[in-house]
Amino acid sequence: MDIGRKIELITKRPTEELLTVENLRHLLEIGAPMQHYIGFEISGYIHLGTGLMAGAKIADLQKAGIKTRIFLADWHSWINDKLGGDLEIIQKVALTYFKEGMKQSIKVMGGDPDKVEFVLASEILEKGDYWQTVIDISKNVTLARMMRSITIMGRQMGEAIDFAKLIYPAMQVADIFYQGVTIAHAGMDQRKAHVIAIEVAQKLKYHAIEHNGEKLKPVALHHHLLLGLQEPPVWPIESEEQYKELKTQMKMSKSKPYSAVFIHDTPEEIKQKLRKAFCPAREVKYNPVLDWAEYIIFREEPTEFTIHRPAKFGGDVTYTTFEELKRDFAEGKLHPLDLKNAVAEYLIELLKPVRDYFEKHPEPLELMREIKITR
């Protein structure tokens, strides 16, 4: 496969940003070992924003010949008080429910879960020279910068936090270099940590990424954050700045069950959540249901997406591109309820293999139901 085609696969939807395309091209041209990683905190149920968005991108990377890795961030989850801050429970969930759920998500999005390496953070954090890398990074970043970066944990600047949380950004950057990662992958909300990684890459003394004597900068790949289904706290949205802020604030959240569809939700749960979804008629700029259609259904174009309607409401209509769907919705030719029902039916069918898996292997899900789910 030529370099141009590899770049197309890596930058296609749901990629929202690549820092930078020029650096990616350089790494491919010099034949640097291409190692991807995406790290996850272990907390509640896996929703579509985690499972399908990451799964889709992993599938693309595999097609481009990139080695893929999922980093099960147990220590990071402990620092960020996930699952009650109980490290033993976090590790148990990571190696059962979360690992199996991500494998099934990757599979339904066209990837090969058997070609994904799963690494538990403890396996590398318990090695002494990992912390040497953390210190090396920390010596190249100001305290003020680290404090601004705590938003990667879903924390707000100015929020009262324990000191361990200030170590978190340096650990996340160290994860990249210690594992020799050339493609650091995450949602857009992790951007601050990745920018630090790019900036310190050529200053590091320990575990810098090198190829033929050249210190390399990693590429940062950020996928789209699916919007949560709930109505935003401010409506209508009047400014572009307000819209950008809301996009991150209103992402899908496992702590707000009706904002998210989980990968193992029943057909009735999926229908119910979509029926209640915020989907104003003719609104195409901020519309969670359209957002899901764009990044899940129309990830590959052209495709065929049929919306079934009674003849008196125009009959069935089939769209092959997202722009066609968006145009009809903007012009009022497509009713919100018809869109919601069609997206729900698509998701029910897409997620059937995941539901089937957890019906045959109920133990991981039963474990999750026994644990108090925290944000």
Swiss-Prot record:
Q: Which InterPro entries match?
A: aa-tRNA-synth_Ic, Rossmann-like_a/b/a_fold, Tyr-tRNA-ligase, Tyr-tRNA-ligase_4, Tyr-tRNA-ligase_arc/euk-type, Tyr-tRNA_synthase
Where are its TM segments located? none
The alphabetical list of record keywords is: Aminoacyl-tRNA synthetase, ATP-binding, Cytoplasm, Ligase, Nucleotide-binding, Protein biosynthesis
Compartments in which it is found: Cytoplasm
Entry keyword annotation includes Zinc: no
Pfam families named in the record: tRNA-synt_1b
| Chief site of localization | cytoplasm
Which reaction equations make up its catalytic activity? tRNA(Tyr) + L-tyrosine + ATP = L-tyrosyl-tRNA(Tyr) + AMP + diphosphate + H(+)
Q: GO molecular function of the protein, one example? A: ATP binding
Manganese as a keyword of this entry, yes or no, is: no
Could you say which enzyme class this protein belongs to?
ligase
* Amino acids binding L-tyrosine: 37, 168, 172, 175, 190
EC identifiers of the protein: 6.1.1.1
One cellular-component annotation, GO? cytoplasm
Q: Where is this motif: 'KMSKS' region?
A: 251-255
| GO BP annotation list | tyrosyl-tRNA aminoacylation
- Top-level taxon in the UniProt lineage: Archaea
Q: Which family does it belong to?
A: Belongs to the class-I aminoacyl-tRNA synthetase family. TyrS type 4 subfamily.
**SUBUNIT field:** Homodimer.
What does this gene product do? Catalyzes the attachment of tyrosine to tRNA(Tyr) in a two-step reaction: tyrosine is first activated by ATP to form Tyr-AMP and then transferred to the acceptor end of tRNA(Tyr).
- NCBIfam families, per this entry? PRK08560.1 (NF006330), tyrS (TIGR00234)
- Put simply, this protein is called Tyrosine--tRNA ligase
Q: Taxonomic classification, please?
A: Archaea, Methanobacteriati, Methanobacteriota, Thermococci, Thermococcales
Q: Which gene does this sequence derive from? A: tyrS
